[in-house]
Amino acid sequence: NIISAHNVLISDERINSEKIGLTGISWGSVLTCITAGVDYRFQAFAPVYGSGFLLETPGVKDRDYFTEPDNVEEWIECYDPISYLNYCNRPIMFAIGTNDSFFSPLLQQQSSDLCEGKVYHSYRGNLTHYHRWKDEEGMIFVYDFMEQTLNGKQMPLTVKSEKSDGKNITVEID
């Protein structure tokens, strides 16, 4: 359905096909990650909360509604974003709350390591797992990322590099 919707958008002459990005929240984020590896016509991606390594994800493995598939390898190959993210060559921003109870910042980091394109991260303190959009407490950082990536606007803050000596953290801001 995502690719079909994208086809509808790019067929509309009023829409600039070079400025279409995709975001998804929670399970929509999982679908965003899969799409990032298969539809190169999107110019940017912003998965919020969800990522790959689904069978290791607390929101999947610790819930009663999911039973482990009979053929784990085949299931991962078909349905887990880790099978697709290594083909992602567009800018992608992974966003998650540090206190998210469904998805893991660590697994999101491991998912982002698979991507070929430029990768950004937005780790938010006290961003609980919810689905609000563009407001003061919502997903304004997704809007900022898309504005920067698609329209060249300045990001509020980008960390260029970081290092730690075990006691102190040094961060270089771009």
Task: Outline where the language-model segments fall.
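Hydrolase active-site cap/lid region
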Residues: 31-74, 122-126, 130-140
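Active-site nucleophile elbow and catalytic-triad environment of alpha/beta-hydrolase enzymes
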Residues: 70-84
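Alpha/beta-hydrolase active-site loop
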Residues: 1-13, 76
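Short beta-strand/loop motif that positions the catalytic acidic residue
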Residues: 88, 94-96, 100
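Conserved alpha/beta-hydrolase "acid-adjacent" motif
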Residues: 101-107
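Surface beta-strand/loop "capping" patches
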Residues: 144-174
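Short beta-strand immediately N-terminal to the catalytic nucleophile in serine-hydrolase-like folds
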Residues: 22-24, 48, 95
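Alpha/beta-hydrolase fold nucleophile elbow
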Residues: 14-26
